[in-house]
Amino acid sequence: VNKAEGTLTMIYRIIGEATHILADVCSGDELSIVGPLGHGFDMSAKKPLLVGGGLGLAPLLFLAEGFGTGQAHILMGGRTAEELFWTKLYQELCSEMFLTTDDGSVGTKGTVMALLPQLFKDGGTDCVYVCGPVPNMRAVATA
């Protein structure tokens, strides 16, 4: 969401009928959007750690912006380096960035769980926000 320009950027993967329809939308077409829904985030963390994988990184970008430049750390994972096109966007917002890829093409080889225990051990975070594949969310919740 860019309030100054009055624009909304959507990031999605074409999987089902709805995203196929969305892929056919052209610049200038009108869309109806409902939201935000839910309860939002507790923004009181002083040292937030954002943990995301795959398309789960999209909503965390908006959250990082909400915390302000340099406040959050990001631990991001993807299948390959190509899936981590987000790095430039997050570099502008986060004080530290930790990367993992399943194939080891960038960052640490493995999932975000490869780095999470060390980040917890080192401290430096007072709240963890996670979005992404269910196995990652489950692993973070039990770490």
Residues of each region from the PLM?
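FNR/FR-type flavoprotein reductase catalytic core
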Residues: 17-143
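Ferredoxin-reductase
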Residues: 1-27
